Curated annotation (Swiss-Prot):
Originating species: Homo sapiens
Signal peptide: none
GO BP terms in the entry: brain development; G1 to G0 transition; gamma-aminobutyric acid metabolic process; glial cell development; glutamine metabolic process; glycine metabolic process; L-serine biosynthetic process; neural tube development
Keywords: Acetylation, Amino-acid biosynthesis, Disease variant, Isopeptide bond, NAD, Oxidoreductase, Phosphoprotein, Serine biosynthesis, Ubl conjugation
Protein name from the UniProt record: D-3-phosphoglycerate dehydrogenase
Amino acid sequence: MAFANLRKVLISDSLDPCCRKILQDGGLQVVEKQNLSKEELIAELQDCEGLIVRSATKVTADVINAAEKLQVVGRAGTGVDNVDLEAATRKGILVMNTPNGNSLSAAELTCGMIMCLARQIPQATASMKDGKWERKKFMGTELNGKTLGILGLGRIGREVATRMQSFGMKTIGYDPIISPEVSASFGVQQLPLEEIWPLCDFITVHTPLLPSTTGLLNDNTFAQCKKGVRVVNCARGGIVDEGALLRALQSGQCAGAALDVFTEEPPRDRALVDHENVISCPHLGASTKEAQSRCGEEIAVQFVDMVKGKSLTGVVNAQALTSAFSPHTKPWIGLAEALGTLMRAWAGSPKGTIQVITQGTSLKNAGNCLSPAVIVGLLKEASKQADVNLVNAKLLVKEAGLNVTTSHSPAAPGEQGFGECLLAVALAGAPYQAVGLVQGTTPVLQGLNGAVFRPEVPLRRDLPLLLFRTQTSDPAMLPTMIGLLAEAGVRLLSYQTSLVSDGETWHVMGISSLLPSLEAWKQHVTEAFQFHF
């Protein structure tokens, strides 16, 4: 499998020693160097296939493009703001994170922030250290009976919910992905955002920073909130519009805010940090010994599992590949690449629409991981993209002038096992269709344009194939073709024919090497092409 040939990994930020040990026990060489400049980082990466970072190292486009051997970047943490995902994807570099490692620590910090907001603990502490005794100034509010709005109900959001419910808080929330039935199972009633704002005494955000979540809390939404609402952001700077938050604090619409993250870190504009009703931390959500150890352990295990071909988890820029490492899917990935390579050789760098069709119950959801493999086969030589792979295939196929669609049909009546994996290429009204399936763990070619092979043709990476179509059954044809092979110094290793379809027969020869030219062949047959994937 691709991405399973790592040899050496650079760890460029401080991580728990368990990370290095797990990598080494998994057979990987490990180099640990911290506080590297961009130039030093590039120099170190010249001999590394893998890179593991936390948040300090900036994996920019310059770094990615200069790191010729780099195949995988692992972020020991959740956010990947410090990795240029577009540049990594374009170069076919896999980016992974550890989505579970920080969850508990971030949730606990959020809960602590809510309690501090309710009782003004940091402000009271500062007052005491200043030699004052101001009991009346720091009148707080109970959490019991208050409503907490949780925006984002993934791992962290649900951990916050269950903890704050123990304080007697009513938890409501919103998440476009998590179903209301699932959130109800951990005690959160989902409502539309416009219904959430006026109900909440406290609001906490736990979403990624996306165009749709940037400025989620803004002047308009603050105006819809209950007067005196308190806001917590331990997720990503920018989800809460900092200018709008400051205005809401100054007007009293917002009674307090607790911020662990900022649009700019560290923030140069100190207006929010210095506001008396703002509690702030220097991005401490993952700063616990347990989270650091867990993140280091998780990213190392993910690297080792990937190298061994066991699994692929935590993928950020190619989520469809997660299933590509399953024992069932692996041979289908090989089949898809083989059919893509066949199509490129047959149709001659096609332009138009590539249709990837899966059939059979076991392939119902496989289209998203099979279509990139088809694209790899189509583009690997035709576009001279030596580094085209399952990560960047969908990006590069658009630049090649191709459109890719996927569809699925159920198994044929009476079909018990795996369905067929089909690929159709439409080219200026001249359809090309190759049909394949997997027998055991071997990809095989079942048919071309309706002509069926019995038995099917094995598709092996070490076996070049020559395919040609004839209209008549000429007894002298096979000796002639073998003679042409001999003239080119190429040996015949296997030979199969299709059943006759519309008066024509497809022939498939396994040969020792690709022929330098097919011109002599085309004088004797209707069409011919060869490929090796």
